[in-house]
Amino acid sequence: MSKPAILKASDITDELRDEIFGISVQAVEQFQLEREVAAYIKKELDSKHGQTWHVIVGKNFGSYVTHEKGHFIYFYIGPLAFLVFKTA
């Protein structure tokens, strides 16, 4: 049974949020390396919602990013932090 996603910050729709949570849970269940988890999420989002999505997954990182309005989310699944955003 997977852990629930804990939202920290977001400016996306509830529908897109739920989709990203679902894709991310699938990635965590399917892959062990953080790099592979991030790559899976990025490829899914690029395919379904157009390019260019960026995905950072890890336990310890800082960030300061510019993103398209309505395309940013930061959340946790267990000990892993997920920063997902789209740029033009």
Curated annotation (Swiss-Prot):
One GO term describing the cellular component: meiotic spindle pole body
Gene Ontology MF term list: dynein intermediate chain binding; plus-end-directed microtubule motor activity
A Pfam family this chain is assigned to: Dynein_light
UniProt keyword Cytoplasm present: yes
Compartmental location: Cytoplasm, Cytoskeleton; Nucleus, Nuclear pore complex
BP terms from Gene Ontology: establishment of mitotic spindle localization; mRNA transport; nuclear migration along microtubule; nuclear pore complex assembly; protein transport
Domain of life: Eukaryota
Keyword field: Cytoplasm, Cytoskeleton, Dynein, Microtubule, Motor protein, mRNA transport, Nuclear pore complex, Nucleus, Protein transport, Translocation, Transport
InterPro entries in UniProt: DLC_sf (IPR037177), Dynein_light_1/2_CS (IPR019763), Dynein_light_chain_typ-1/2 (IPR001372)
Role played: Acts as one of several non-catalytic accessory components of the cytoplasmic dynein complex that are thought to be involved in linking dynein to cargos and to adapter proteins that regulate dynein function. Cytoplasmic dynein 1 acts as a motor for the intracellular retrograde motility of vesicles and organelles along microtubules. May play a role in changing or maintaining the spatial distribution of cytoskeletal structures. Also a component of the nuclear pore complex.
PANTHER family hit by this protein: DYNEIN LIGHT CHAIN
Subunit text: Homodimer. Cytoplasmic dynein consists of two catalytic heavy chains (HCs) and a number of non-catalytic subunits which present intermediate chains (ICs), light intermediate chains (LICs) and light chains (LCs). Component of the nuclear pore complex (NPC). NPC constitutes the exclusive means of nucleocytoplasmic transport. NPCs allow the passive diffusion of ions and small molecules and the active, nuclear transport receptor-mediated bidirectional transport of macromolecules such as proteins, RNAs, ribonucleoparticles (RNPs), and ribosomal subunits across the nuclear envelope.
Protein family per UniProt: Belongs to the dynein light chain family.
Official protein name in the record: Dynein light chain 1, cytoplasmic
Organism the protein comes from: Eremothecium gossypii (strain ATCC 10895 / CBS 109.51 / FGSC 9923 / NRRL Y-1056) (Yeast)
Lineage: Eukaryota, Fungi, Dikarya, Ascomycota, Saccharomycotina
